[in-house]
Swiss-Prot record:
Optimum temperature is 26 degrees Celsius for hemagglutination activity. This is Temperature-sensitive hemagglutinin tsh autotransporter. The C-terminus is blocked. Cleaved to release the mature protein from the outer membrane. Adhesive and proteolytic functions of tsh lie in different domains of the protein. The signal peptide, cleaved at the inner membrane, guides the autotransporter protein to the periplasmic space. Then, insertion of the C-terminal translocator domain in the outer membrane forms a hydrophilic pore for the translocation of the passenger domain to the bacterial cell surface, with subsequent cleavage. InterPro entries: Autotransporte_beta (IPR005546), Autotransporte_beta_dom_sf (IPR036709), Autotransporter_pectin_lyase_C (IPR012332), Bact_Autotransporter_VF (IPR050909), OM_autotransptr_brl_dom (IPR006315), Pectin_lyase_fold/virulence (IPR011050), Peptidase_S1_PA (IPR009003), Peptidase_S6 (IPR000710).
Length: 1377
């Protein structure tokens, strides 16, 4: 089929020319003598890739294999590919252009290249090949016309169908121009590939044959090419395979069998790769150079045009459709519209090439098939919108349909069984035939909408099968009946199946590669149900066939005449002979007994155990359900991708999401062994393997991943973004168990194999982002990168990852185990009622120990216990953490609390409140410590030690240790070595015993304090002798000193002495000094007066209705009043309040007086704070009032109301903490006044008011560091008076009036406020109540609009009081009717 020519150097051509090997004197000796290296004068500096033929033995052979097949690192678009030899030495970089896409080259033997959707380019002396395949080889296109060039070794065969799997390559724009391909500015690099006889050449020129022609593809780089024969031919010294400067980083020489293989060049003018020529000749095995025939542009254009009939134009003016008639006997047909007829040519007998291409133009065209048309290799191209229909059930077959970009074609014609409709072009084809279409569809570009209509029997089938390939097309389903989902396949590079809101069930997903996309791109949620599990009763029974061919794994039934039994066999390979007659197994057959049911179950179990694989992608608005029968253990493996807004549900079995191993070209084991014997171990024997390091990353995003009774694994190179809901399931994030497809890259069939592969680089590790919810004895294993929260109940969490970051997490009846080498950070709150076990691992809470952050937030962490095991165990508690739980360290582990960092400047209100609990420290820990051999460090920490504690080495820096009782009255802290700086130890005593600090070996540091809390009040006569601290005798006396501490409302200072005894030094409590702390008392008194301040706020808004009520004509009215204000008092007290009042009243005319009676409701929201407390009061209330206005100008106003208060305050004095309480109050007030009119528009109004109230008493009890503390305020009945004068002026219009006024009042208490009683272990003292008074002044406006609407606005302040209103704005509206 393919013969090689020898090359001879031609001075005229300035290069090599082809001479038949049968020509005279063309022998290897003469060729070698004549082939002077003229082309070596051409400097070649470029980077390229390799292909078939002869290559040198310095480079790994796998490079040339991967290059030819666009695999490994030579995937299309790859840039800056570095090439190294077998010794690891740098050879060069392919950096002049991105790696080209070789998919247009015949994928089996590489002797032809697609240059048009229906035409290939090769050499005419290749007369034996009759078909080609593209991509993964799951397709075959037959040659119908060879189109041989008359005077050039070139042909452009026509194919029987439009190719859908790949796009044609671009061809050179210059064509046969002498010297064109020496222009290294325009053509800096040349690549080739082919399947010629495979040789390896050593530096001595010795050839080793690795394989015969057409066995496999190899490829690489060649140098710039000189021209001869008027530019029709080009040549170069490609045989100089060790000359990297001349021939690039991967030199390759074409051998016998490479004829017709392509030569590509990167054209910098067009900025793309182009096909320059096809290889025609070389000068023998391991020769010096090759020749190529340049693509003859005029010739191929002529051949393309010869296969076209005249364009068909639809004209609306002609009226009616284009009527298409066809005579299948003659292969002639016509399209007629009115008086215009267009001839067409279709298939003649078996001659497909007789069919010509038709091009349709004219807007909104219509075609009516009157006869079934067999167009052979002819295609239809639509330049404008068309509708193609038939009224008699006619069909159409041909090469396929091309729909141009922006064009829509409505196709209402069915196909023929056994034939596929090929569709390409960027436009849209809508298939809208009727009934059952027995033909298939292969789509390679644009959009196809399946909208087949039901026939009179209700039957619908748009196509018998659908194949989506090339990565360019989209197929859209209008409903779920259009196609059987199991007949959909995604071929080479795939495309999109848009289910368009329709739910489908797939029993098989046939996806060749990552390009396969199953999507739903509409708002209506669709559910994809997977039902691929094989049931025993569905296992097919096969019988023996004379073809001797079958599928390995299939079940066969044999009625054995020799034993009179029915025997069942499983086929082991693809070919077979006779069944064994003695119920035995052999190399071909596996005997599986006499029971059909058992045999079918065995086959089904094996199939289900083997698992299922989907290489493709899930996208859009989808739910995916995969519910397997109980007992199925096989895995559903996804190494493609997912980005769906719905839920992926897996029930039973296994689910594995993983990255994808990079596919490589491969050879047989014998070839690999032969190369290995020569020192080249690069060659692979399968497309993927578990040992390879190069994997492709994959991403999976679900709204939710629901797992029940499932073994789920997230493998290497995979990222998962979701919320996992696991029920009785195992979840492994960072699963070393992965799968490979031993058929990867070779079509839709797959062969799964399970193994292990552990990512060593961070970039290859799995990543999880989201939340994991565990329930019902689920297990979570975190082995790789983890970012998310955990909510677990009755489950187990294991962490082995060194890159785990936990968000908000709550574990109930769930243990957390950190295994050896793990390093986890709980960056947000962590709460667990179970143990946290840290075994030679590190757990950091809030922040890592080496992290200096300026955006730290308060974090709460609680566990039943924190257990460290192993010398390398670490517990690091970052700054601004609240830790709770006992810490137990078995070995020489390390516990660190506190570190660097600053609070975020923009804390949320919640975090501000949380931070207030720190009491000025960075960290808070409540728990006991059991770490006799460990090292414990604390910085800026408040430790509430609630049980006896031990530490091997303890370092304290600005830390306070509070001894709390726990289960025993007093506790002891024991450490071998203590280094304490600026720290304090708060101990308790009952005047008999006390808490104690014991230091066994050494004690160092400075500026440390001892504080003592008294659990009962000692008398001044008590003489104490209680040891508090025991340390080695060499310890400095001033290591500890007595310090005054505020406890309750008192300053308590212990009296200490230092004594030596039995080789130890002790700090002994001899007595105490107690004094009242005025600051704490004042803070308490200020807080207890909040109710009075709230009372004054309400008083100032009791009687403000007079301006609303005067001169009202209506009989009733409703009103709303809004007050916003703030006040202040001693002790840094401020409050901000908003008061809302609503009411309704009725007017009664009583002689000379108008009486208004009404009811009201009120709500007040108050925020109050002082130096040592802050909080909020919310008040609700209601009441009634009566207002009387005399025509003389006199008035009165009386009111009574009830207020309920809800109070929530944080108190930072005397250890009071949070206090939530309720209170109640009553108000009764009366106001009188008289309005004197100075003129018709001005007035003065003296006023007097008296308000009585009832404020409920309040008592608070708590414990501060073991001391009982209380504060109490008695109930009180305040009586407040107010006198003052208001003056104003009224401005009037036709339907409006406006009154401006100003007022000055004096407000004063007639009774004292309530006394406050404070009590602690030092005793009880009373802060007496007091009177207060203030001046109030303000201005306001009252406006009337018509007879019904009144608006008011008033601004008011006060001065000279202990509590003052800083500002108050009062707005009201009234409507009368």
């Amino acid at each position: 089929m393919n013969r090689i020519y020898s090359l001879r150097y031609s001075a005229v051509a300035r290069g090599f020319i082809a001479v038949s090997e049968f020509a005279r004197k063309c022998v290897h000796k003469s060729v070698r003598r004549l082939c002077f290296p003229v082309l070596l004068l051409i400097p070649v500096l470029f980077s390229a890739g390799s292909l078939a033929g002869t290559v040198n033995n310095e480079l790994g052979y796998q490079l040339f294999r991967d290059f030819a097949e666009n695999k490994g690192m030579f995937r299309p678009g790859a840039t800056n590919i570095a090439i190294y030899n077998k010794q690891g030495e740098f050879v060069g970089t392919l950096d002049k252009a991105a790696m080209p896409d070789f998919s247009a080259v015949d994928s089996e033997i590489g002797v032809a290249t697609l240059i048009n959707p229906q035409y290939i380019a090769s050499v005419k002396h290749n007369g034996g090949y009759t078909n080609v395949s593209f991509g993964d080889g799951e397709n075959r296109y037959n040659i119908v016309d060879r189109n041989n060039a008359p005077s050039l070794d070139f042909h452009a065969p026509r194919l029987d169908k439009l190719v859908t799997e790949v796009a044609p390559t671009a061809v050179t724009a210059q064509g046969a121009v002498a010297g064109a391909y020496l222009d290294k500015e325009r053509y800096p690099v040349f690549y080739r590939l082919g399947s010629g006889t495979q040789y390896i050449k050593d530096s001595n020129g010795q050839l080793t044959q690795m394989g015969g022609a057409y066995s496999w593809l190899t490829g690489g780089t060649v140098g710039s090419l000189s021209s001869y024969q008027n530019g029709e031919m080009i040549s170069t010294s490609s045989g100089l395979v060790f000359d990297y400067k001349l021939n690039g980083a991967m030199p390759i020489y074409g051998e016998a069998g490479d004829s017709g293989s392509p030569l590509f060049a990167f054209d910098t003018v067009q900025n793309k790769w182009v096909l320059v020529g096809v290889l025609t000749a070389g000068n023998g095995a391991g020769g010096r150079g090759n020749n190529w025939a340049v693509i003859p542009l005029d010739f191929i254009g002529q051949k393309f045009n010869e296969d076209n009939d005249a364009p068909v134009t639809f004209r609306t003016s002609e009226g009616g459709a284009l009527e298409w008639s066809f005579n299948s006997s003659t292969g002639a047909g016509a399209l007629t519209q009115g008086t215009t007829t267009y001839a067409m040519h279709g298939q003649q007998g078996n001659d497909l090439n007789a069919g010509k291409n038709l091009i349709f133009q004219g807007q909104n065209g219509q075609i009516n098939l009157k006869d079934s048309v067999s167009q052979g290799a002819g295609s239809l191209t639509f330049r404008d919108n068309y509708t193609v229909t038939t009224s008699n059930g006619s069909t159409w077959t041909g090469a396929g349909i091309v729909v141009d970009n922006g064009v829509s074609v409505n196709w209402q014609v069915n196909g023929v069984k056994g034939d596929n409709l090929h569709k390409i072009g960027e436009g849209t084809l809508t298939v809208q035939g009727t009934g059952i279409n027995e033909g298939g569809l292969k789509v390679g570009d644009g959009k196809v909408v399946l909208n087949q209509q039901a026939d009179n029997k209700g039957q619908v089938q748009a196509f018998s099968s659908v194949n989506i390939a090339s990565g360019r097309p989209t197929v859209v389903l209008t409903d779920e009946r259009q196609v059987n989902p199991d007949t959909v396949s995604w071929g080479y590079r795939g495309g999109t199946l848009d289910v368009n809101g329709n739910s489908l069930t797939f029993h098989q997903l046939k996806a060749a590669d990552y390009g396969a996309v199953l999507a739903n791109n509409v708002d209506k949620r669709a559910t994809i149900t997977l039902d691929y599990a094989l049931r025993a009763d569905k296992v097919a029974l096969n019988g023996w066939s004379e073809s001797g061919k079958g599928t390995a794994g299939n079940l066969y039934k044999y009625n054995n005449p020799y034993t009179n039994t029915t025997d069942y066999f499983i086929l082991k390979q693809s070919t077979y002979g006779y069944f064994p007659t003695d119920q035995s197994s052999n190399a071909t057959w596996e005997f599986v007994g006499h029971s059909q049911g058992d045999a079918q179950k065995l086959v089904a179990d094996r199939f289900n155990t083997a698992g299922y694989l989907f290489h493709g992608q899930l996208k859009g608005n989808l739910n995916v359900d995969n519910r397997l029968p109980e007992g199925v253990t096989g895995a559903l493996v996804m190494d493609g991708a997912a980005d769906i807004s719905g839920t992926f549900t897996q029930e039973n079995g296994r689910l594995t999401l993983q990255g994808h191993p990079v596919i490589h070209a491969y050879n047989t084991q014998s070839v690999a062994d032969k190369l290995a014997a020569s020192g080249d171990h690069s060659v692979l024997t399968q497309p993927t393997s578990f040992s390879q390091e190069d994997w492709e990353n994959r991403s999976f995003t679900f709204d939710r991943l629901s797992l029940k009774n499932t073994d789920f694994g997230l493998g290497r190179n995979a990222t998962l973004n979701t919320t996992i809901q696991a029920d009785n399931s195992s979840v492994t994030l960072g699963d070393s168990r992965v799968f490979i497809d031993k058929n990867d890259g070779q079509g839709t069939a797959f062969t799964l194999e399970e193994g292990t592969s552990v990512a060593t680089k961070d970039a290859d590790k799995s990543v999880f982002n989201g939340t994991v919810n565990l329930d019902n004895q689920s297990v979570l294993n975190i082995n790789d990168i983890f970012n998310g929260g955990i909510q677990a109940n009755n489950s187990t969490v294991n962490i082995s990852s060194d890159s785990a970051v936990l968000g908000n997490s709550t574990l109930t009846s769930t243990a957390l185990n950190l295994n050896k080498g793990a390093n986890a950070l709980a960056s947000q709150s962590f709460v667990s009622d179970g143990p946290v076990n840290i075994s030679d691992a590190a757990l950091s809470l809030n922040s890592r120990p080496d992290e200096v952050s300026h955006t730290l937030l308060p974090v709460y962490d609680y566990a039943g216990s924190w257990n460290l095991k192993g010398d390398d165990a670490r517990l690091n508690v970052g700054p601004y953490s609240m830790l709770s739980g006992n810490i137990n360290v078995q070995d020489k582990g390390t516990v660190t609390l506190g570190g660097e960092g600053e609070l975020s400047p923009d804390l949320t209100l919640q975090n501000q409140m949380l931070y207030s609990l720190f009491n000025g420290y960075r960290n808070i820990w409540s728990g006991s410590l059991n770490a006799p051999d460990a090292t414990v460090s604390m910085t800026d920490t408040q430790w509430s030690m609630n049980g006896n504690s031990t530490a091997g080495n303890m370092k304290l820096n600005r830390t306070i240790v509070g001894f709390n009782g726990g289960t025993s009255p007093f506790t002891t802290l024991t450490t071998d070595n203590l280094d304490a700086v600026q720290s304090a130890f708060v101990m308790r005593t009952d005047l008999n015993k006390a808490d104690k600090l014991v230091i066994n070996k050494s004690a160092t540091g400075h500026d440390n304090s001892i504080w003592v809390n008294f659990l009962k009040k000692p008398s001044n006569k008590d003489t104490l002798d209680i040891p508090l601290v025991s340390a080695p005798e060499a310890t400095a006396d001033n290591l500890f000193r007595a310090s005054t501490r505020v406890v309750g409302f008192s300053d308590v200072t212990p009296i200490l002495s230092v004594r030596k005894e039995d080789g130890k030094k002790e700090w002994v409590l001899d007595g105490y000094q107690v004094a009242r702390n005025d600051g704490q008392g004042k803070a308490a008194a200020t807080f207890m007066h909040i109710s009075y301040n709230n009372f004054i706020t309400e008083v100032n808004n009791l009687n403000k209705r007079m301006g609303d009520l005067r001169d009202i004509n209506g009989e009733a009215g409703t009103w709303v009043r809004l007050l916003n204000g703030s006040g202040s008092a001693d002790g840094g007290f401020t409050d901000h309040y908003t008061l809302l009042q609503m009411g309704a009243d009725r007017k009664h005319e009583l002689g000379s007086m108008d009486l208004f009676t009404g009811v009201m409701a009120t709500y007040t929201d108050t925020d109050a704070s002082a130096d040592l407390y802050s909080g909020k009061t919310k008040s609700w209330g209601g009441g009634f009032y009566a207002s009387g206005l005399f025509r003389s100008g006199a008035y009165f106003d009386v009111i009574a109301k009830y207020i309920h208060n809800e109070n929530k305050y944080d108190l930072n004095f005397a250890g009071a903490g949070k206090q939530n309480f309720r209170s109640h109050s009553l108000y009764a007030g009366a106001e009188v006044g008289y309005r004197y009119h100075l003129t018709d528009t001005t007035f003065v109004e003296p006023q007097a008011e008296l308000v009585w109230g009832r404020l409920q008493g309040q008592t608070f009890n708590w414990n501060d560091s073991g001391m009982d503390v209380s504060m109490r305020r008695n109930s009180v009945n305040p009586l407040v008076g107010r006198t003052g004068v208001v003056s104003g002026k009224t401005f009037s219009g036709k339907d409006w009036s406006l009154t401006a006024r100003a007022g000055l009042h004096y407000e004063f208490d007639l009774t004292d406020s309530a006394d406050v009683h404070l009590k602690d272990a030092a005793g009880e003292h009373q802060i007496n109540g007091r009177k207060d008074s203030r001046m109030l002044y303000g201005v306001g406006l009252n406006a009337r609009f018509g007879d019904n609407t009144r608006l008011g606005l008033e601004v008011e302040r006060s001065a000279f009081g202990k509590y003052n209103t800083d500002d108050a704005i009062n707005a009201n509206i009234r409507y009368s009717f």
